[in-house]
């Protein structure tokens, strides 16, 4: 997409709640799985080049094709962690895989965090409203503020 096309397309897809712009989840997981790392990187670069966003937050899981290539493009990677044995085993496996694939730069960018749990009984925009102004929302805003201060 060209810059004008991207801005128009994004404008039609972006939803906003309390000064937080976000793209709603995809309708089909296959859309995520079939997107290559190169396509993700190209899209993100266009957003950086042609939008006014200061921060882009990605919620990535293992269903993203070529995840490690995409993670290599990130300046900071926040990994929410839990202390239970299953979660710890998954983290160890992930870190081991990064080491085997010689992705030390990705490992170095990871910041393990323990964000507060968010619970809401509402759905849709009510849920997003609750999320933005919850303890979790405060936690994320503070993380972003510290990142800006630290450069």
Question: Which residues fall in each region the model found?
Answer:
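Phosphate-binding loop that captures ATP/GTP phosphates
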Residues: 1-22
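Conserved catalytic-core segment of NTP-binding enzymes
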Residues: 42-132
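Short, flexible/disordered intra-domain loops and linkers
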Residues: 1, 33-34, 125-126
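Short gly/ser/thr-rich secondary-structure transition/capping motifs
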Residues: 4-5, 38, 58-61
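NTP-binding/hydrolysis catalytic cores, primarily Walker-type P-loop NTPases
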Residues: 126-151
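Residues that form generic nucleotide/phosphate-binding pockets
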Residues: 13, 46, 139
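Short glycine-rich substrate-engagement loop in P-loop NTPases that contacts/grips substrate
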Residues: 30-44
């Amino acid at each position: 997409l060209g810059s004008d096309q991207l801005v128009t397309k994004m404008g039609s897809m972006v939803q906003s709640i309390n000064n937080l712009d976000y793209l709603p989840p995809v309708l089909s997981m296959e859309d995520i799985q079939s997107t290559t790392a190169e396509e993700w990187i190209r899209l993100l670069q266009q957003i950086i080049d042609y939008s006014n966003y200061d921060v882009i937050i990605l919620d990535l899981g293992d269903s993203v094709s070529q995840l490690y290539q995409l993670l290599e493009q990130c300046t900071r990677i926040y990994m929410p962690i839990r202390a239970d044995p299953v979660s710890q085993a998954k983290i160890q496996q992930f870190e081991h895989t990064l080491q085997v694939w010689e992705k030390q730069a990705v490992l170095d960018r990871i910041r393990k965090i323990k964000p507060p749990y968010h619970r809401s009984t509402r759905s849709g925009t009510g849920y997003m409203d609750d999320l933005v102004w919850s303890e979790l929302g405060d936690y994320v805003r503070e993380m972003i503020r510290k990142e800006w201060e630290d450069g």
